[in-house]
């Protein structure tokens, strides 16, 4: 049973564990395991999101098709379309178990983690390069010319969680 006032502890612990697993996959260049983890994450978050507004079997089939195309075909339109729903699925999971104080603590701790991960240990940069190389990442892909930019999943997900908690509370 997760208490709203201390839910940030479990969420931060889960982020630390997931980061550790991601770094292990990176170290061993385990792209097949990364692909499986990515597929399952996309599938389940899409399933949760779609289940909110369609019959369960249709939600299951649509989540399966989109997760498969996103993971195995590298289509920018499917990738970005799925991202719009993935964060809604994450919000359905996390908003009910987080209160305003917890989400503020999470945002504060994530900001510190992000700074350390990008500027000090640089493991976030290594993870981003690994994900870009195998073309499996969380976030929006914005192509321009012969290049592309990425808006990371955390830049979408955390503000959505914050907004969801505020809507739930007030």
Feature-to-residue mapping (PLM):
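A membrane-topology feature that recognizes alpha-helical transmembrane segments
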Residues: 1-170
